Amino acid sequence: VLKRSIEDRLAPANKQIVLGHGTCGGIDTEFKFNPALVDRQKVADLRKRWGIKESDFVIGYSGRLVRDKGIISLVRAFDMLEDADDCKLLLVGMFEVRDALPEDVKERIENDPRIIYTGFVNGGMEYYYSLMNLYVLPSYREGFPTGVLESQAMELPVLTTRVTGCCDAICDGRSGLFITHDPEDIVEKIDEIRLKHRIDGKFGREWVKEYFDCRKVWCEIEKLYK
């Protein structure tokens, strides 16, 4: 992001810095996004509410449901999965008028029984991450993707693109894998996780704790002001 900002001359280079490892506020890995603290009964209640079985493999996304986030590619990739009767696509977020999805994709999301569309969720995201087996963000651009960090803190493998912001938000091959916007590539990488169990989510949690925990970011902010 810093490199692009300097190249695009958004501000003088000597007035721009990267705070810590690139996130403006960090995330609370100790008291909020911590799988050890999740109330399992609440997770069970959410599973019942959304019709998700323990045996289901849940591919998750959180955020605005718009073209810019790669939702079209994600839905098409989900349609292409083979031997996927036990797969669910969990979309936590809401449709928007600006950059709206095509009507056919929107209708598919609303009507496919394997796709769970929650609409706007006000808090408790740690419980929705607890329903997922994999987090996918096929975005075209980001500042710094908070959902990618939160999901890794919840020990989820992550698939995301190599675009600005996202390219610094996973440890490639360890906490997640990079994808393109090609649905076939997304399918291939989903199956690397779903069938081959290539990524161990526990590494992702430790990586996020090390570099993006909010307390460490706050220390960097304090140093900046001093």
Stretches with model-predicted labels:
Residues 140:
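Aromatic "clamp/platform" in nucleotide-sugar-dependent glycosyltransferases that forms part
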Residues 120-122, 127-132:
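Short alpha-helical donor nucleotide-sugar binding micro-motif in glycosyltransferases
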Residues 90-117:
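Short, structured helix-loop element that forms part of the nucleotide-activated donor/catalytic region
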Residues 48, 198-211, 223:
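A short, well-ordered alpha-helix in the C-terminal region of glycosyltransferases
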Residues 53-69, 75-78, 90:
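Conserved donor-binding/catalytic core segment of Leloir-type glycosyltransferases
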Residues 157-160:
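Short hydrophobic beta-strand element within catalytic cores of glycosyltransferases
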Residues 1-43:
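Donor nucleotide-sugar binding/catalytic pocket of nucleotide-sugar-dependent glycosyltransferases
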Residues 172-173, 177-183, 192-197:
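Conserved acidic donor-binding segment of nucleotide-sugar-dependent glycosyltransferases
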